[in-house]
Amino acid sequence: MKLPLTLFFGLGLTLTTTLHAQDGQPKREYTNFQDTTFQLSEISVTAKRPMQVEVMKLGVPAAYLPVTTNTLPSRLLANHGITNIQDAARFLPGVRVQTSYGAFQQISIRGFDHSIIMVDGVRDERSSIDNSYPFMDLTSVERIELLKGPASVLYGQSAVGGVLNIVRKAPTAQQHVNARVAYGSYQNLQTTLGFGGRLFGPLNYSANFNYQTQDGWRDNAMRRLSGYLALGGKLSEADELDIRIGALRDFYPTEIGLPDVMPADIYRTADDTKAYDRGDMLPGLDKKARYNSESDFMYNRNFNASVMWRHTFGEAARLTDKLSYTYDDIDYFGTEDLAYLTSDKPIYKHYYKSGNRKVYINLDSLRYDFPLRFEHIARTWNNQLELNGRFTTGSVKHNYLGGYSLIALYRNSFSGYDLGQDVYGPGLTGQGSVYNPHSLGWMDTRFSKAFVSRIYMHGFYLQDLLELNEKLKMLLAGRYDLYSYKRVSGVPTIDGRAEFEMPADSLFTRTATSTFSFRAGLVYIPTQPLSLFASVGSYFKPDNTTYSDNTRYFDRNGREFFPNKDSRKIFDPERGIQVEVGARYELDDKLSADFSLFYINRENERQYMAYKGEVINGEKLDKYVVGQVGRMDSRGFDLELTYRPIRGLSLTAGYGYTDTRLRKIATNPYLDGENLVGKRYANSPLHSFYVYADYTIREGVLRGLGFNFDVTYQDEVYRDFSNTSTFPSYWMTDASISYRLPNRVRLRLNVNNVFNTDYYNEALDSQYVPGMPRNFLISAAYSL
């Protein structure tokens, strides 16, 4: 009698499923399709699921791919109490996340920012315009996948250092319930509820809800609320449906940090002796003190939905169409500048030198300047139509993927920058104490202008992984993109609200770009546990500069040029190429290692070099100055090791070396390129390191007792191109202990920043934000 057996295989980094096999039973061949079930004709079969990486879309074992990938499973996030992307990135070598303004998160991979973030394989298009933005919590996440190196061949523009893919929990037929409540330092309350199973007929579901509130250690209270629902299943033998809906409403405190570090060497007025060096922080500041205005706020409201349909014709062809829609609203008001009072007269106790004159400075009082009011409302439509499958030509097996991607981004940005008109109230003109910050009064706001932008992207792509033989694999991939952008600024709002009348199409300025991207690589597998690879790949990033009478333009050779007013392209796209070699080793479930050595070259970066109203060389500028400044590159290597010596114990370590520098900068009247060549690129540490250990006792009277600890290191980070300002390097240690009760409840105590390290990883200009000191989190979680 034959008994059917269904096995559900996870997609985590090292998950394998093993059943006991009869001698003489034939082995099941690997298939490139990521089937969720297998029908087995015998009750006893041996099967091992090769680790696959969804971000590459080919459904082949990771050992076949000439790329570097890393995966963080949800188990790691849960063990370490991680619910945000900045904490998760500490366990990804070569990745750094920096938060600014309290909630805007900027991700750099292998030294380059503007990195692409995806959710369930769908690009977050906010990165097409902005370099930082708030991001969702991670409570509904199954795993985080990182594809390093240029990825434009699969995901289009701007994928230079890599792509981060957030994979949310999929619907499953297995009934499950997960509930967690946690409470910790600074009134940190977290509640999460997840459940799922079979809904009716062929449909399964998975749902997750999360609420978090925290007073904050610097009186920076925050609230986060999110919900997620996934529905799906096999409608027939050939058809699958997957529907996902997510929403969030988050409130964040804006964050302007502590008063400025010293802008120059500071001297005492009484005797001209030096009091502080340039860059020193004032002594005696209360790091828990909050200097923001009482009226500051930041909301992020988001709704996203996707529908995926897949039809399988057979092993040779599978057609997939995925349509998604995202609405995102970032609503912000923040006082951004803490300025010391200054005077040309010797009325204060200190002064600094500006050229040949003395500027007297009051280090006891502050002026609250530049309250900034804006709201970005973005609507994105994304459709991916793909055909993939497997066929054979002679002795060569082909795993192919071809597709067409259409993306439309409609963004309306509203601003209220006219102080006194758009921002008003007693808090606008207040002055405060450096050592005793307090409320300066309320402020209210309105919008006066709207900035309207539209982006359209069409991508046509094809990739093929050729299995030449058991030991040699080859990847060939190409993509052609059409990109268009249009914008109009200064559109009047209606009654100060986030509303406007759409201007005529003739008032928009436009730019358009088309380009080809590629990736090619070889994999050699000398023995089953070891694979060696080499690859080369390219990327591009369109330039959205449009013509303006108020701007002067310089090319990458330092020469001024005068574009045509009707030109569709002012600057060439930013381009880059990566060469990479690496090795991957996996011995059963005991030991795994990944190593990669890379070089990335980037051309045509565009920057603002001077702003209208600035005084340069004694001249007050009547126009903005913008130009493509030259070339930079990133050289380095990544290493990650995981060792499981005994049952229940896992040790993982990772190290990233990333040396990103300016290599060629043309000199022009507004940029001294010679002094910048060789400087380190901003926001990227040279060294990053982590190690973590998870141990759970599986037998005896202490069965269910678990221990976790991690140590991370971040090297100093330069904050500017001139390499004059840095975030100092620091080590961080976290630890936790947990115990699983017989009733499926796990109790856990997390201690973060065990050694109370004093560190900085965030700043607003010269206003540094201190990191959180030692803190605790106690949680109880139930799983069924």
Where are the language model's segments positioned?
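Acidic/polar loop-and-plug regions of large Gram-negative outer-membrane beta-barrel proteins
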Residues: G232-K234, A238-T312, I330-A378, G425-K449, ...
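Short acidic/polar hinge/loop motifs at secondary-structure boundaries
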Residues: V97, Q106, V122-K148, V167-K169, ...
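N-terminal periplasmic accessory domains that precede
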Residues: I85-A88, Q105-I107, S132, S158-A179, ...
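Gram-negative outer-membrane beta-barrel transporters
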Residues: E470, Y599-N601, K620-D720, A781
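Structural signature of Gram-negative outer-membrane beta-barrels, strongest in the C-terminal barrel
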Residues: S236, A378, K397-L409, F451-R602, ...
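Membrane-embedded beta-barrel scaffold of Gram-negative outer-membrane proteins
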Residues: T312-G314, R318-S324, D328-G334, I570-R635, ...
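Conserved C-terminal beta-signal and adjacent last beta-strands/turns
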Residues: F8, H376, N388, Y400, ...
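Transmembrane beta-barrel wall of Gram-negative outer-membrane proteins
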Residues: H176-N178, Y183-T213, R218-E255, F297-T312
